[in-house]
């Protein structure tokens, strides 16, 4: 088998092993440093998207619990409610 064909075959098989090792789920490698957001959004965690501090910035606040308005709820069983005159808040 020529070298080029062998390299192409290896390149085709190599990513497949990662796919199988992950249990058949697509594994997305994040090389920009936003891996924490991807980690928090996996599984059955009750995680909302990170809130961006300033428009155009990738920095913000990530919560392990539900995001409600500008804050994170203190526990995973809390949910976000709207209080008339006071705005949004967590109800636990």
UniProtKB/Swiss-Prot annotation:
Subcellular location: Secreted
Recorded domain comment: The cysteine framework is XX (C-CC-C-CC-C-C-C-C). Displays a mini-granulin fold, a structure composed of two short, stacked beta-hairpins connected by two parallel disulfide bonds. This newly described fold is derived from the same cysteine connectivity as knottins (ICK fold). The name 'mini-granulin fold' comes from the structural homology with the N-terminal region of the human granulin.
GO molecular function: acetylcholine receptor inhibitor activity; ion channel regulator activity; toxin activity
Tissues expressing the protein: Expressed by the venom duct.
Subunit details: Homodimer or pseudo-homodimer. Three dimers exist: homodimer of VxXXA, pseudo-homodimer of both VxXXA and [hydroxyPro-74]VxXXA and homodimer of [hydroxyPro-74]VxXXA. These three components exist in a 1:2:1 ratio.
Top-level taxon: Eukaryota
Species of the source: Conus vexillum (Flag cone)
Purpose of the protein: Alpha-conotoxins act on postsynaptic membranes, they bind to the nicotinic acetylcholine receptors (nAChR) and thus inhibit them. Through its two C-terminal domains, this homodimeric protein would bind to two nAChR allosteric sites, located outside the nAChR C-loop of the principal binding face and at the adjacent binding interface in a clockwise direction. This toxin specifically blocks mammalian neuronal nAChR of the alpha-7/CHRNA7, alpha-3-beta-2/CHRNA3-CHRNB2 (IC(50)=370 nM) and alpha-4-beta-2/CHRNA4-CHRNB2 subtypes.
Disulfide feature: 63-72, 68-80, 73-90, 78-92
Keywords of this entry: Acetylcholine receptor inhibiting toxin, Disulfide bond, Hydroxylation, Ion channel impairing toxin, Neurotoxin, Postsynaptic neurotoxin, Secreted, Signal, Toxin
Family under the similarity heading: Belongs to the conotoxin D superfamily.
Residues annotated with 4-hydroxyproline modification: 55, 70, 74
Signal peptide positions (record): 1-24
Protein name (record): Alpha-conotoxin VxXXA
UniProt PTM: VxXXA stands for the form with the Pro-55 hydroxylated. A second major form has both Pro-55 and Pro-74 hydroxylated. The two major forms VxXXA and [hydroxyPro-74]VxXXA exist in a 1:1 ratio.
A GO CC term assigned to this protein in UniProt: host cell postsynaptic membrane
Residue stretch(es) of the prosequence: 25-45
């Amino acid at each position: 088998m020529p070298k080029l064909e062998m390299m192409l075959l290896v390149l085709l098989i190599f990513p497949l092993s990662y796919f199988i090792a992950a249990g058949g789920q697509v594994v997305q490698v994040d090389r920009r440093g936003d891996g924490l957001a991807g980690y928090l959004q996996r599984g059955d965690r009750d995680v909302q998207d990170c809130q961006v501090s300033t428009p155009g910035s990738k920095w913000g606040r990530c919560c392990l619990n539900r995001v409600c308005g500008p804050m994170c709820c203190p526990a995973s069983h809390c949910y976000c409610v709207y209080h008339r005159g006071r705005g949004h808040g967590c109800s636990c």
